[in-house]
């Protein structure tokens, strides 16, 4: 499940969507707007994307993770628009039978998403 949204990310709903009776672990990563970036104070961030391209890349990433790890479910949600300090910009959730797999897949997801999905932020 992948989504780009201009709305506040509901990470509780995301977590419920990926939970499964076959999964003994659910890992959730939330990226938030932090106050300091490279020694400079951040007041807010604006996120923009080419939606079709970003969703396509997110779907490719979801498929890749499903191929590499025996996970149960995956959820990726990225927010667009103007975000204030503390607001959630991205949520990645993974469920799997065991926690080690969920952590590995979740870390790979967020690291690869940051490098490959065409979403830009402006301070």
Please give the residue ranges for each predicted region.
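N-terminal, polar/charged subdomain of small-to-medium soluble alpha/beta proteins
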Residues: 1-90, 95-123
């Amino acid at each position: 499940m992948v989504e780009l949204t201009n709305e506040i990310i509901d990470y509780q709903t995301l977590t419920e969507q990926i939970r499964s009776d076959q999964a003994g672990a659910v890992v959730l990563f939330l990226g938030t707007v932090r106050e300091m970036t490279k020694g400079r104070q951040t007041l807010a961030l604006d996120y923009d994307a080419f939606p079709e391209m970003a969703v396509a890349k997110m779907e490719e990433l979801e498929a890749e993770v499903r191929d590499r790890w025996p996970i149960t479910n995956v959820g990726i949600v990225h927010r667009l628009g103007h975000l204030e300090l503390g607001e959630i910009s991205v949520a990645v959730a993974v469920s799997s039978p065991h926690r080690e797999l969920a952590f590995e897949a979740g870390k790979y997801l967020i690291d690869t998403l940051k490098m490959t999905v065409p979403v830009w932020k402006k301070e």
